[in-house]
Amino acid sequence: MPSEWLLLATLVFAAYGAGQVWLVQLSSYPLWRFVGADEFRAYHAAWWRSIWGVVLAPAGLTAMASVLMIWLRPPRIASFEIWVGVGLQAALLVGTAVWWGPLMARLGAQTGGLDPKRYRTLLGTHWLRVAIVTAYALLIGRMTAEALGL
């Protein structure tokens, strides 16, 4: 029974993450170009502080739940599916630590506004992050349906 609860909790976290990453990609990031050069540094710093609870904490819980499923594998779920999920979470964490996090930290231009080249790079490469988060949510959704016999 604990494995089914873990799977359901992971489904909630994964669905939340998928909704959040699409909102960021389609709404939040595109709006950054409208922030004035004089205000961008303060805006970006406030944005960074604001995402810890609503973005980073749920993402961390999703990653931890993914790893916990190695030991608490739900019935009817093949171990390779668990490992695919762990791989997707690892790719997301490594990509964030190595690429997207540092890129976001350097979005401010020397002049104080948004660096247009880095901003375009973020908008273009962030689609990979959207794909990873979405793929994980779909995988967990399929696993939940399988575990519940749907």
Segments predicted by a language model, with ranges:
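Interfacial loop at the N-terminal end of multi-pass membrane proteins
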Residues: 3-61, 108-120
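Core segments of transmembrane alpha-helices
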Residues: 55-69, 129-138
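Mid-bilayer segments of alpha-helical transmembrane spans in multi-pass integral membrane proteins
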Residues: 90-98
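Juxtamembrane boundary at the C-terminal end of a transmembrane helix
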Residues: 141-150
